[in-house]
């Protein structure tokens, strides 16, 4: 089984490209995913390269930008290529099968969003004497 689920923030704006001859859209970006544990009081993150294909690639490039929170599920894939200097390079990345935009828009300011505050519910007391059971 090869399945990964990640939630993190984009480290820079996604890069949208189209494959020559086929016109298939591909979008590449890096997701910064916080680790569960802190090292010496500092939160650490892993920087995971992601590739998205097709319509999801176009949507990601159009609606997401640096710093936005998103979820990705997909598979881990390793590929190789020959670099300009003649050496063989290996790349490990997540090929996204599903993306979720957890923050929207290219120009909204994420600094004003507080994710640590619980939502307060309006709870109105009910008089139990009117309940028939």
Swiss-Prot record:
PROSITE patterns: SSB. The keyword DNA-binding applies. Residues 1-103 form the SSB domain. Homotetramer. GO terms for biological process: DNA replication. Keywords: DNA-binding. One of its GO terms (cellular component) is nucleoid. Pfam families: SSB (PF00436). InterPro entries: NA-bd_OB-fold (IPR012340), Primosome_PriB/ssb (IPR000424), ssDNA-bd (IPR011344). Gene3D superfamilies: Nucleic acid-binding proteins. PANTHER family: SINGLE-STRANDED DNA-BINDING PROTEIN. It comes from Clostridium acetobutylicum (strain ATCC 824 / DSM 792 / JCM 1419 / IAM 19013 / LMG 5710 / NBRC 13948 / NRRL B-527 / VKM B-1787 / 2291 / W). This is Single-stranded DNA-binding protein 2. One of its GO terms (molecular function) is single-stranded DNA binding.
